């Protein structure tokens, strides 16, 4: 899905697997021994912890550190990854100083979907929720999950729907529904539907 064109020493040029899923982004260097700080795209970063290697894709221009940035896609072996406050920190094999870590700033992290561990009961990967239709208990359609976001202790569904303006013009709007048991009744991945205790005028 895209090969690397150049990379600093120690980074292995690669390409993304067909089932690659973006799971996080490198925020910055952490410490002076090559560690990086990561913002995971999930409140449960178990997929990151279970993988022995990660695919990194070069950051978009606005996220580039301005120096030593690689291009394309590289594959790095993970020596260690662990939680740190509300982020994840990780150390890659062969990346042993702060300069090496800073060269990765802004990089997008991908993993093959097939490598994800099986989610526990009532736990879901964000990628499996995006695109699901959302209805309330009365069967009223509320829209489709476009994205998710994290707000402290829980995730929030970003549900896109079509609204009518006063002049009758249809516009795309968005409603935010907390992904917590108080509002989420059922999640049917196979049926592509989430049932919620929510009203259209909330």
Curated annotation (Swiss-Prot):
An accessory protein needed during the final step in the assembly of 30S ribosomal subunit, possibly for assembly of the head region. Essential for efficient processing of 16S rRNA. May be needed both before and after RbfA during the maturation of 16S rRNA. It has affinity for free ribosomal 30S subunits but not for 70S ribosomes. GO terms for cellular component: cytoplasm; ribosome. The keyword Cytoplasm applies. Binds ribosomal protein uS19. InterPro entries: PRC_barrel-like_sf (IPR011033), PRC_RimM (IPR056792), RimM (IPR011961), RimM_N (IPR002676), RimM_N_sf (IPR036976), Transl_B-barrel_sf (IPR009000). GO terms for biological process: ribosomal small subunit biogenesis; rRNA processing. Keywords: Chaperone, Cytoplasm, Ribosome biogenesis, rRNA processing. Belongs to the RimM family. The keyword Oxidoreductase does not apply. This is Ribosome maturation factor RimM. SUPFAM superfamilies: PRC-barrel domain, Translation proteins. GO terms for molecular function: ribosome binding. Its main location: cytoplasm. Residues 121-202 form the PRC barrel domain. It is found in: Cytoplasm. The PRC barrel domain binds ribosomal protein uS19.
């Amino acid at each position: 899905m895209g090969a690397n064109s150049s990379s600093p020493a120690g980074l292995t040029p690669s390409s993304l697997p067909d089932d690659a899923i973006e799971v996080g982004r490198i925020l910055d260097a952490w410490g002076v021994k090559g560690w990086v700080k990561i913002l995971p795209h999930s409140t449960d970063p178990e997929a990151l912890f279970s993988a022995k290697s990660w695919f990194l894709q070069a950051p978009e221009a606005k996220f580039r550190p301005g120096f030593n940035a690689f291009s394309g896609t590289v594959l790095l072996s993970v020596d260690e990854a662990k939680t740190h406050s509300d982020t994840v920190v990780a150390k890659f094999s062969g990346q042993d100083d702060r300069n090496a870590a800073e060269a990765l700033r802004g990089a997008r992290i991908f993993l093959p979907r097939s490598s994800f561990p099986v989610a526990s009961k009532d736990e879901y990967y964000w990628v499996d929720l995006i695109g699901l239709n959302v209805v309330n208990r009365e069967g009223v359609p509320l829209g489709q999950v476009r994205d998710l976001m994290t707000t402290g202790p829980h995730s929030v569904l970003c549900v896109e729907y079509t609204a009518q303006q006063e002049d009758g013009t249809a516009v795309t709007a968005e409603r935010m529904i907390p992904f917590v048991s108080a509002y989420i009744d059922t999640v049917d991945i196979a049926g592509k539907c989430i049932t919620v205790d929510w009203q259209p005028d909330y």
